């Protein structure tokens, strides 16, 4: 939330505010305690249990605006079939699940990535996407400088790992949406989207 606030993209305080943000800037972040205070309370029991509960997993399956495409990042690769199966049971039109950076919806560009894509109740499409970078090591980021995000977005910083992560994640999303017929086409389209981005967007939002 601190990062979004820094970038001029404050969290939504209600469903109505989230909808307005999506209409205005095609992006919104709504905290779980706003979407479902009860689920937030259950997650906050983690210190009591001493471990995560299934609530952490199924909370990610919530789709409050009935988006036709969902993206799911997980940490443990052995659970991809479970999440794909849940999407089919819930009738989610399209969903992708993959092992993301730190369990987030963020493709790791320095490693091959297995992606499970579901469409309705059909059997999942399982693809292994190649690494986008030759160096298998992720560069350390001890400073966690929020201004670096702006510099990368505006093209003022040549951060190969960050750009590859963004473009790679966009590519998986495009493939999941049915906008690309292959991994190669998805990555080409994603590169074009990144190159054509509005580099002043974050400044305007702030």
Where are these regions (language model features)?
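Glycine-rich anion-binding loops and their surrounding alpha/beta cores
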Residues: 5-12, 17, 22-206
